[in-house]
Amino acid sequence: LFKDIDIPSFTLNEIITAKPENLNIKTPLLHFSEYLKKGYYPFSKEDGFDEKLRQIINITLENDIPVYAEMSAAMGRKFKQLMMIISKSVPFKPNMSKLAEMIGTGRNQMHDYLLYIEEAGMIAQLRDDTSGIRGLGKVEKVYLDNTNLIHSLAEDDVNVGNLRETFFLNQMRVNNHVVSSSETDFKIGEFSFEIGGRTKGNRQIQNLGNAYIVKDDIEFSSDNIIPLWWFGLNY
């Protein structure tokens, strides 16, 4: 969009059957790297992007959520601290007691706090495919909503595994029901996806059907290996 490149969208089935292979895009990995840092928001090309994003984060966490949930502004600062922890971490299953201790609040409210932040578009919670309280599955991992937020909050301490998984979830949840998997990072319907870098092996999926390795830092597909950037073409 911001590079004036006309690219069609592809369904998940088209992506896993390598339909994007025929795209004629020069230096896609360079564009992809730029997108991860500054491409998600509509004001990405405007001057002062970094400051504008920080303002959005601060207003959302320190004003919008506390006003909506009738909390003190001090809770907003704790929410930002929580997001900074998530931004720098390997994707993890939330330990509510530990998170509450780290930000100095009560454990019993952590589920509600995370849900407020998720509904505000600041984080994404990956759930299993069971229906639990409120009709939602059990939370297995917590991510920031998008990779621009990671770069803004983590600055020079970005965890690349976190960045890759955040991108995949952010892009694929728009048109698909993405859930956690006990064997791989993500599952969408009958398909399983394990995310990694260029040297990622296929040991983890070798005994699974309809399973794919999604690799960063590659331009083209091969067998059951799919470039990560292709999943940004789903809508």
Where do the protein language model's features map onto the residues?
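Conserved catalytic cores of phosphodiester-cleaving nucleases, focusing on short active-site segments
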Residues: 168, 172, 186-201
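Catalytic cores of nucleic-acid endonucleases
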Residues: 181-183, 196-235
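Amphipathic alpha-helical "lid/sensor" segments that cap RecA-like P-loop NTPase cores
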Residues: 16-58
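Accessory nucleic acid-recognition modules appended to NTPase machines
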Residues: 42-181
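Short glycine/proline-enriched coil/turn segments at helix->beta-strand junctions
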Residues: 104, 173-177, 188-191, 205-212
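Conserved P-loop NTPase motor "coupling/switch" region that bridges the ATPase
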Residues: 1-21
